[in-house]
Amino acid sequence: MSTPRCFGWRAIGVAAAVLARLPQRATLAFGASLGVLLRPLLRRRWHVARVNLALCFAAESAVERERRLRDHQRSLAVALFELLRAWFAPPATLDGLAEVEGLSLLRDAAAKGQGVLLLTGHLMHTELATRFVAEALGAPVGGVVRRYHRHPCLERLLDAARTRRLGPTVGKFDTRGMARHLRNGGRLVYSADQDFRDGHAFVPFFGVPAATFVGTPQLARAGRAVVRFLSMVRGVDGRYRVRVCDPGLDALLDDPAAFAAQYMAVLEAAVGEAPDQYLWVHRRFKTRPPGEASPYVR
C-alpha cells in the first residue's frame, strides 16, 4: 500500500478510518441524509428492489411497498457507514453498541476442535455483525468469504482491513481453501443465498421460488464442520442485536434440497425481523423455473 500508485487509496483509507469513528448518532443521521440523496440515483438498483418487494410482499399495496423501499434506501445508506465501522473502527468505539447472543455455540465447537460454517445471507450489515462477534470472542472470527476486486490497490486495502479486524479471508470460489480452513477447526462466515445458475434448487423465499445453491452441505461435510447461522438487527435506538443460532441444518447435510429449503426459511425469519435491512437491490430471483421470464426485465 506504500507504492506511489496506491497513494490515493491510502488517502481514502485514512478518510474511511475517520468516518468509522463517528458516534452512532452521527452515523445514523448521515446515513438518513445520504439515503435521501440516493433516491434519484441508482435507478436500476431501485427497480430491482421494487420488483423484489412486489414479489415478497405481494399482499401489500403499492403505497406500502414504496414506504418499504424508502426505509430500505435509508438503511442501505447507513450500511455504507457500517461497513467502514466493521473494517476500520477501533475496538473502543464499538463498546456498548451490540448485544451478542449464542457465543457458546462457537466456543463449544472450538473446544472440540471442530470447524463452524457460519451461514448468513444478503443482510446488509453482515460484516459488522462478524466484527461484533470477533470483539465478543476477543479474537478474529476466523474466516470471511469475499469477492476479489479488479483494482489491486482497493484489493489490498480491503483485504488488509478485513484480515486485521475480522480474520483471514478466503476467495469466493476457493472451495478447497474453505474446506481446509474448516477442517483445521476454523470458522467461516458464508452467505449462501446465492444464485449460481448451475447447481441450484428452487425453494421458497417469501413464498417465491428462489434458485438456491445446493453445494453448501458438501462444503460442510468436506470441512467436517457444524453449521450455524449469523444474523443481526439494528434497532430504532441504533443499538444492534447479534444472534448466532443452530438453524437445524446439520441433520440435512445428505439432502441438499431440504437443506436449501430450511436455510431459506431461517433466513426469511431473520429478514422478517427488520425487512429494511435485507439487500433488496440483490437480484435474488434472476434465475426462474423453466418457462418463466425474469421479473427484472422492464
Describe these PLM feature segments:
Residues K112-K172, D198-A201:
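Catalytic core of membrane glycerolipid acyltransferases/transacylases, capturing the structured
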Residues A92-A98, T163-V170, F206-G207:
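Short, flexible loop segments at the rims of nucleotide/cofactor-binding pockets, characterized by
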Residues V51, R131, A160, Q218, ...:
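Surface-exposed charge patches
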Residues M1-T120, H125, R156-A161:
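Membrane-anchoring hydrophobic helices of lipid-metabolizing enzymes
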Residues G96-E99, L123, H151, G171-K172, ...:
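A conditional alpha-helix N-cap/helix-loop micro-motif detector
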Residues S2-T3, F7, L38-L41, V63, ...:
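Non-catalytic C-terminal accessory region of glycerolipid acyltransferases
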